[in-house]
Amino acid sequence: MAVAQVSNVLGCVNPLRKITEMAHRVGAVVVADGAQSVPHMPVDVQALDADFLAFSGHKLMGPMGIGCLYGKRELLEKMPPFLTRGEMIDSVHRDGAVFAPVPQKFEAGTVNAAGAVGLAAAIRYLQEKGFDYIQKKELELTQRAMEGLGALPYVHILGSKDPANHTGIVSFTIDGVHPHDVSEILSSDGIDVRAGHHCAQPLLEYLGVRSSTRASMMFYNTPEEIDALIESVSTIRRRMGYGE
C-alpha cells in the first residue's frame, strides 16, 4: 500500500503509524511517500514502522534527479534488482550471476556522484537549521498567508482551516479564474507558485475541483513575501476583467 505522509496538495499530516499498523494486520507492505514530510519535520522510519519510505532531493533544496529510498533490510534482500549494470553484482558466470548484497545490488551503473554530494549538503543544511526553527517559521508564514488569502471573499483555501495542518502549503482557488491564469499573473509579479492537479487528480476530484493554485512556504521566506502574494492575489479578478 502506498501512502503520502504529508499531502502535497493540502499539507495535512496523515497518521502514518496508525495506517501502517492497520496495513500490517492484513499482511500489506507499506510504501510511504516522504517527499513532502522529510524537508519540513523530523521523520523516524523505525517509529513509523513503514516498510519503505522515499523522498526526493529537490524538495529539500538539493539537486534534481536524485532521491533516497529507505527499506527494511529483510524486504530489500527478497527483492530482485530492477536494473542490471556494473557494480551491482558479486560475481558473474556463464550460467548466471550472484548479486551484490543490499544496498549495492540496487546501485547499478555509474552513480550520480555530484547529485549525492549536493543532496548530502542540503541535508546537513536542514539539520543545522533544526526542525524546531523550521517548523516554527513555516507555521508563522502559513498562518499569515491563510489569514490574508482567507479574508478575500472570492478565494477558497483547500483543506483544514488550522494553519498547523498545512505544513507550509496553502492551495486555493479563485472564483472565475483558472489556476493557470492565477499562476501566470503571479509569475508576472515575481511570485512563483504551482498550478494544476499536482499529480493528485483523485484527491482534487474528491474535493470537487479540477485544479488549484499551490503556494509553498519554506523557512527562508519572509513575511514581506507573503504580503506580496496576498496583495497580488487580491488584484487578480480585477486584472481578469471582473471589476473587483
Residue ranges and their predicted role:
Residues 1-244:
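Pyridoxal 5′-phosphate
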